[in-house]
Structures are given as structure tokens and as C-alpha cells.
Swiss-Prot record:
This is Uncharacterized protein YvlA. The chain crosses the membrane at residues 10-32, 45-67, 77-99. It is a multi-pass membrane protein. GO terms for cellular component: plasma membrane. It comes from Bacillus subtilis (strain 168). Its main location: membrane.
Amino acid sequence: MNRNQAIIASLCYFSVFIAPIIVPIVAYFVVNEKETKRHAIRSLISHIVPFVGWLFLFIALLGGAVAIDGDSLLPVFVIIGGAVIYFLVVIGIIIWNVIQGIKVLRAA
């Protein structure tokens, strides 16, 4: 992988801050090198995971809102616990993307 390809691959990972899904898709279709495409797919998957998690959290929030009755606080704790776990996973994914972007830049 040459320096330009490494920069494109690292931008796919760093795009978690700017345009999470668009940059890896564009890089995948524009670049011809196999390793850069592999990095684009890996970063795309890591950008899609928080979105899917958000959908699950939203569905749980709606389900918890429906299930809340006057006496039980269990749905509230489940919603709060789910939100905490979701945000920890998102922070972990962001850190992973930054580490991978730095690794790709250093390797070139």
C-alpha cells in the first residue's frame, strides 16, 4: 500500500467524526487497491454498528415507555442501562477507529 492509499484508508476510519457512512462507501468504489477496499469495508461496518445499536435502543425506549406502569421502575432501569451500554460501545468504536486510522498511517 502506497502513501496515498494509506491516507485514503485512514480517512475511512477517521470519517467517524465527519461523514461516517459516506466516506467509506465512496472510497470503496473509487479506489482499486484491494487492501484499501478492505479497510473501507471494515470502517463502514464499524460506522454502521452504532446506527443499528441506536435503532435497538430506540425500539427498547418505545417498548419501555409502553411497559411502564405506576408501580414498577424496572423498564426505566432497563432503558437507562441500555443507553449506558450503547454509549460505552459507541465510545469504544470511536476509539477503535482512531487507533486503526493511526495504524494504517504508520504502516505506510
